Amino acid sequence: MSGRESLRSAPPRQEVDLVTVERADWRDACRRALDGGERFCGAYAAGSGSRRRWNALFARGPRTRVLTTVFGEDGPPTIVDLTPAAEWDEREAHDLYGLRFRGHEPLRPLVAHPLDTPSWTVPVEGEGVYEVAVGPIHAGVIESGHFRFHVVGERILLVDLRLFYKHRGLERAAEGSELTDGLAFAQRACGACAAANSVAYALACESVLGLTPSRELRRARTLLLELERLYNHLNDIAAVCAGVGFAAGNMAFAALKERAMRLNESLAGHRFLFGSIEVGASRLDLPSPAVDRARGELHELREDAARAWREIRFSASVQARLDGVGVLDPDAAARLGAVGPVARASGLGLDTRAASPGLWYGSAFAAAVPPSAGGDVAARLEVRAIELGVTFEMLDELLAEPVGGDIASPGGPTAPVGVARVESPRGETVCVVEPDMHRVRRLRLRTASYANWPALAHATAGNLLPDFPLINKSFELCYACVDR
């Protein structure tokens, strides 16, 4: 698929429907959206006092429906029984905004960490059942996360995830800032997802401001997104190799990741692509010599990655450790709202790139679902390997001509709320911007990691405790994305 074909099939702007719902009709409205084939992709609170609002987002193709209801001092009814994917959204709103959801009580703390430990632990009792607590301080140089395993022998009954230890309040900090300045909060939420978060924020703001991204701007942003996907997928394959003790594969893909990040720095001036994206503009400016040099480096990188992948693919001992471990079946993946490579490895053809207005992708973009989408570690690894090939092809196409910084054109219709959905390396990132003139009234950033952490807990149950590090690495989720 050529870039021109992508541009013809991709709408230039996000399509958003804002629908006000009476409080008494809230559950019925959400049920109708789900029954109509729409997919829950986030919820958030806004407003204050008697004008407090609860909003739920549902997606279908390039269109996003925002259902909103005013509930005042009374809490809205829960929809977790309709879509379990909403559980974290409701628990977070309870902790940060004091919302009480009728039908979802008692609500275990998610963001808050009260000293009253029984208030947030899951009681599991039975003969031979005991707990293994891991974290939040770990032996490795990683961020803070607490995993409480309930096991019989070495078999995991369930794992309770406790994150948000270093929550920074970025969404609240962004309130009152200029729309153009608010991008810094989204960009710095997570280094590994900086480009995806920045593009999502920029597209949401441009929808509010009536700006339409130009051809060059769409191409530059897609280039940055694919560069980010490249080094993340290389890193994730290296991590799985480390999880099974395959040092040769770990070292090979870690070296490939380093080369990809050095390429980022040479093209964008930053290894994590910070500072390349603006609201209504792009700072990326690559003349012919730069793109030619980058294409050559990417060609070599692709050949070396294919060679390293063959070493993994034909290693019987590695494959034996991956098959059948950490299975996430399709029904659970859909029910829990899994996105990205995790969802595709479970057989769900879900890829936001096929429905990303304002970018280079189009409706002809096909999700990479492996032939044997068993939902296990092997399938999640294979999805990333397949997507590496797609990303290399996309990058070669995007760099076929010089890339110039360009701006979005004004004069388009403005929206009362800006919503953007962008496919990050880990899956769909959803950004909502509610404006107050040219300032941020409310920012909501729901990343793929936020969506996938509950799916990780589900995939872990029934496995052996020593296999958890491997399962965890096959998801490779961000802590910072939930600590935003």
Where do the language-model regions lie?
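Predominant activation on well-ordered alpha-helical scaffold segments within soluble catalytic domains
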Residues: 90, 94, 198-206, 224, ...
